[in-house]
Structures are given as structure tokens and as C-alpha cells.
Amino acid sequence: MDQIAFNELAGWVTGAGLIGRSEGELMTGFCRRVTEAGIPLARALVILDTLHPIYEGRALLWRSDMPETGEVREYGRTNEGEAAENWRRSVFFHLLQSGETMMRRRLAAGDPVDFLSFRQARDEGMTDYLALIHPFAAEGVIGEMDCVYSSWASDATDGFDDADVLALQRLAPFLNLAVKSAALARMAGTLAETYLGRDAGRKVERCGAPRATAPGYRF
């Protein structure tokens, strides 16, 4: 990916986040543009915790064989039982505990498949796998929303080249910030409907609360 393509993609996802695209729209548009820029992306996953009494978070999934129809899945708690065991065996848990921010496995080149997601990717024909974690600073944490996890897989014969990996590392924060913004907007709407009622909550979302004024100033 050359610098022009990088700038265009970073600009697109930033603008899409600002105008209020949904998480699914952001994921689909981003991944499609990544492949159009020449990166052999076949699978992508972004995970972000949420503020919900039942669901722990949302997973955004994209596949190159269904480029226009990304999937959004909500998942339950992972703090007990089999879900907790699976979480503790995951590459994302390893990154979170180790303080590392990236792990790559060249699956077709014989790299170790030491986590379940690597084995699953290899069995699905993936040749390269990149896992990333972007933790928030303390002041950016909201409840359990403390980082964004993502994974990127290729099924090309030679997988990703080093320039592809670098581009994904540099572009992922743009997508993550846009997804975080969309998630917060969605959660704000849910809270408004919960505490104000559906009609009043939607009215606040559409119209906003009255703007504050101060002597000599208008906001």
C-alpha cells in the first residue's frame, strides 16, 4: 500500500466515524478498501467490550468472500465456565497479560500454532495471521471497555508481506477509534431510552438537550 492509498483509507474511516456510520458499516467499508489497496486480506475481526447487563461485548467480522455483508455478533460474559477457559487460552488474553501489542504467525511457513485461533485459521486455509491489541489509557477506560482487539488473516499463497503488516498496524487505530466512537454513540442511545423511555430518549438523540448559555457567550 502506497502513502496515497494509506492517506485515502485513513481519511475515509475517520470521516465515516465522524458522520456516524455504524460499527458494521465501518468494518465492511474499511476491509473492502484494504483489499482494493492490494493487501490480501481474507478474514478480519474486531472486538470491543460494551456496557450492557447481559452482553460483554461485540465482535465485528468480515470475510473476503462476502465483502459487502460484514457480521456483528454480541457475546456473553467470559468470566466463568467454559467461556472463561476459552478466553484464558486465547491469543488476545496472552497479549493482554504479556503487555505485547502484536503477534503474527505465518501459518503456511510452519510457525507454531500455539493458540486455538491460529489452528482454526490454518484449518480454514489461512496462510498468515496477525493479532493486535490497542489498550486505552486509564482516562479512556469506560467500565470494562478498556481496549480494542483485532485480527487479520490472509489466504494468499505467501500471506502478508512486511509492508502489508506495517500498513495494518498503522491503519488499525483509525478503525478502532471510529468503532469506539460508534459504540459509545450506540450505548448513549440505549442509556437514554432506558432512563428516559423510548420516545423521550429518541427525541434527545435527534434533537439534543438545550444548549447552555453564559453571560457574553453563546454555545
Residue ranges of model-derived segments:
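Signal-transmission linkers at sensory-effector interfaces
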Residues: M1-I19, E25
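Regulatory loop-to-helix N-cap segments in sensory/regulatory domains
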Residues: F136-Q169
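Regulatory sensory and allosteric helical modules in signal-transduction proteins
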Residues: M66-L130
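Juxtacatalytic helix/coil linker segments
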Residues: A185-F219
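Signal-transmission/dimerization alpha-helices at domain junctions
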Residues: S154-D158, A167-R186
